[in-house]
Amino acid sequence: MMKFKWIIFSFLAVVFFISAGSTILQTKPQNQDPGVGPVKNVVLGPIDNQKVADGKKIYLAKCVVCHDLNTKKIGPPLKNIAKERMPEYIMNLLVNAVQMQKQDPFVKDLLKKYNNVLMPDPAISQTQARTVLEYLRSVAK
């Protein structure tokens, strides 16, 4: 009888940890808002190291003045943005910064927190925005 109880207990423990792990391992961001802009659907696969390298170059050239990965600067830190927002949202913010700042409620709230300092339009293409997204995905791990 004691052996049977241990088998049942072990089985239930395994089921519990598997179900708990499945929510822990989810990669979808909590917020499912795609933002305002032309990017409607981004299909993510494994991290592409070439895109990461290209995206890092763009980040260092156009973003790092205002955004650090870990600390607040003129704008918010970006290390976990790929975990917190949809890929479409991030790309739309990069390719459609002006409209996002005018229309998106989350960005409007951020502006208030950061002294209403507007993000300049980075003037990058969707292809370039995709590489920046890939870089941000790589640092969010």
Predicted regions and their residues:
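N-terminal secretory signal peptides that target proteins for export/translocation
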Residues: 1-2
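C-terminal capping alpha-helices of c-type cytochrome domains
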Residues: 6, 11-14, 23, 89-93, ...
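Bacterial Sec-dependent signal peptides at the C-terminal "C-region" and cleavage site
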Residues: 18-30
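Electrostatic cytochrome c docking/interface patches
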Residues: 28-58
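Gly/Gly-Pro-rich "capping" loops immediately C-terminal to redox-active cysteine motifs
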Residues: 52, 56, 68-99, 116, ...
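Short cysteine clusters
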Residues: 63-66
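Proline-centered turn/helix-capping motifs that create local helix->coil transitions or kinks
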Residues: 99-105
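Short, internal strand/loop/helix patches
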Residues: 107-115
